[in-house]
Amino acid sequence: MFAIFQTGGKQYKVQQGEKIYVEKLDLEVGSKISFDQVIMVEGSVGTPFVKNAVVNATVIKQGKQKKINIIKFKSKKHHLKRQGHRQPYTQLVIDSISVK
């Protein structure tokens, strides 16, 4: 069984037991979370969400992605600006997908 749910402004297609990376959630490692904004479950499409559908997950890691470098350069002016960014993420493992 698969489901499509949304969190952090993005949509994720998941199956039970799958590990996914989502935008940072303010939760401790080991805590449980349930997503009720389920867009699709095994062929039934919601308008906009499937009623009584829940995706349950457990937080297994909090971290930051690989650093990306941003360089702004003005030619002929000897002006160079360097900046870096590391996007925070939360890694989840999907425990169950249920429709009541």
Swiss-Prot record:
InterPro entries: bL21-like (IPR028909), bL21-like_sf (IPR036164), Ribosomal_bL21 (IPR001787), Ribosomal_bL21_CS (IPR018258). Keywords: Ribonucleoprotein, Ribosomal protein, RNA-binding, rRNA-binding. SUPFAM superfamilies: L21p-like. The keyword Heme does not apply. The keyword rRNA-binding applies. GO terms for molecular function: rRNA binding; structural constituent of ribosome. One of its GO terms (biological process) is translation. GO terms for cellular component: cytoplasm; ribonucleoprotein complex; ribosome. Part of the 50S ribosomal subunit. Contacts protein L20. Belongs to the bacterial ribosomal protein bL21 family. This is Large ribosomal subunit protein bL21. It comes from Ureaplasma parvum serovar 3 (strain ATCC 700970). The gene is rplU.
